[in-house]
Structures are given as structure tokens and as C-alpha cells.
Amino acid sequence: MSDDVTQRSFAAAVKDRLRRYPALYRILRSLVLPINRRRQVSRWRRNGRPVPPPHAFKQLTIEGYRRAFRLASLVETGTYAGDTVEAQRKRFRKVVSIELSPDLYRAALARFANRQNVMLLEGDSADLMESVVAQLEGPALFWLDGHYSAGITAHGNLDTPVQRELEIILASADDHVILVDDARCFGSGDYPTLDAVRTLVGRLRPDWTCVVEDDIIRIHPTSRPLHASRGERPSTAL
């Protein structure tokens, strides 16, 4: 057995033991998670920032834009296992997450059953987004990550509803911030091209910024800071 496997087995045993003491486990977890997250991001940067970036970097990016634009609500498409909801639910006053898969939706309901500021919706985000946007109380941060990626994910009418999502959000009267994951996929399958996204933003929000950096499309009012995530390189226009 390798040292790496032995270390993982030991860590799992320690975690199981600590879970017998929930209060202590929560305290230690809150201290260890930020450290692990910073290590993941540092390792990724040392390796040349390969695409896609780690989950930890995506969460730092969301947090950076939340602070820069002082946003209280987060809307996510593609709940999946609920890791983004878990990472952000204490930072936003309200978190809305839409999931197409009935199984993943039910699992998320169980995971966040007692979280009053978390609203989970089941269905196609292309159909639900208009209602969600209409119910928001002011500008929100949108994390668009709802797409078919094989495995346990669900497939709607299209591989991705992002075109319709963007049209609805950009047509809103509020100055929302939109972050779209997996920029590398655009131009393939049902994804619009990056040029098409730029054209859409220019038509509906001509005074907004539309840039891509580290596999994330960032769309937001130009009047606010561009580099919202800690340690980001200058963004590159689409």
C-alpha cells in the first residue's frame, strides 16, 4: 500500500471519529476548508492555470464578484451535488438553485432541508428563469452551470439552455452579474459561440463588460471593478 493511500485512509478514519462530536467537527472543518481551498488554488496556479480550474477557484471567483458588486442573492443553474450551494449559502442572503434531474433535486432537498435561505427548484432553467428573475429583489449574481455532462446529469431539450438564460437575465431591468462556467464548451453542440454571446450582450446591454478568463465568461456592468477575484490576471475580452 502506497504512502498516499495510507494517508487517505488515516484521514478518513480521523474524519469518521470526529463526526461523533458534531460541534467539534464543524469548528475544525470551518478552519481546515479555507486552508485546503487556498492550497488547491495555489497548486493550480503553479501548474500554469490549466482549464478547467478547480472548484475552489470558482468559489473564490463567485465570492470576489459578490463583494465587488455587493450582491445579496445568488442564482445557480445546475445544482448537481449542491457543493456550490453549500459553499455560498452563508455568504448570500438568498440562494436559488435550479436542477433538471429529479434524483439530484431530491438529494439536494435532503441536504438543505433546514436551510431557510436556500430555495431549490426542479425543472429546465430555460423554462424557470423568467419566473426566478421576476421574483428577485434587486441585482443578483448568476452562476450558470446547467448543462448535460453525461453520467447522472439530466438532458433537456438542448445540451445547454444558456442562450435562453442569458436572454432573460440580460433583458431584466436590474444590473445583475453573470458568470458562465465552462467557456471552453462554447461553439460546440448546442452552445452558442463566444462571438454570439458578445453580440447578445452588446445588443441588450451595450454598456456592459463581457470578458472570459480561466474558463469563466464574466458579464457585468462596466461601472464596477473588473477584477473581482483575488489574484486574477487581467481578463481578456471575448
What do these predicted regions represent?
Residues 2-141, 147-238:
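A short alpha-helical cap/connector motif
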